[in-house]
Curated annotation (Swiss-Prot):
Entry's family note: Belongs to the transcriptional regulatory CopG/NikR family.
PANTHER family in UniProt: NICKEL-RESPONSIVE REGULATOR
Sites where the protein binds Ni(2+): H79, H90, H92, C98
Source lineage: Bacteria, Pseudomonadati, Thermodesulfobacteriota, Desulfuromonadia, Geobacterales
Organism encoding this protein: Geotalea uraniireducens (strain Rf4) (Geobacter uraniireducens)
This protein's name: Putative nickel-responsive regulator
Purpose: Transcriptional regulator.
NCBIfam families linked: PRK00630.1, PRK01002.1, PRK02967.1, PRK04460.1
Length: 139
């Protein structure tokens, strides 16, 4: 981690008031912490857009396990990408519906592709990809 640098910014009063409310809601100790998090989030998002950076993501799926062959298709996709899918959690939500959370690691474009494949399987009721960084380059 490098040396901490102080700098000033000019900001509209109304925008600052809204930002201060956000800081309170999220529990930040000060504006600096909130601004650092915003900068980090922007840098992480840029890496996802590039597609070649190593990222980690979670793919969350909700589906009815009674749908014919659906569980088998999802398992087949997971085995196809066993090098990238590093963990899986399966939860029975009720007598019919299951929640599956998969941790996927790889290049951003690969993680997105795997998520799209899984979410696109016929019978998946809801799916969502949440990507983050490996943290290696953030300070």
């Amino acid at each position: 981690m490098g040396e901490t640098i102080r700098f000033g910014i000019s900001i509209d009063e109304t925008l600052l008031e809204s930002f201060d409310k956000l800081i309170d809601q999220k529990g930040y100790m000060n504006r600096s912490e909130a601004i650092r998090d915003l900068i980090r989030a922007s840098l992480v998002e840029l890496k996802w857009e590039a597609g070649e950076e190593e990222t980690v993501g979670t793919v969350t799926l909700v589906y009815n396990h009674h749908v014919r062959d659906l569980s088998d298709k999802l398992t087949e996709h997971q085995h196809t990408h066993h090098d990238q899918i590093i963990s899986a959690l399966h939860v029975h939500l009720d007598a019919h519906n299951c929640l599956e959370v998969l941790v996927v690691r790889g290049k951003a474009r690969e993680v997105k592709q795997i998520a799209d494949e899984l979410i696109g399987v016929k019978g998946v009721k809801h799916g969502k990809l949440v990507m983050t960084t490996t943290g290696e380059e953030l300070h």
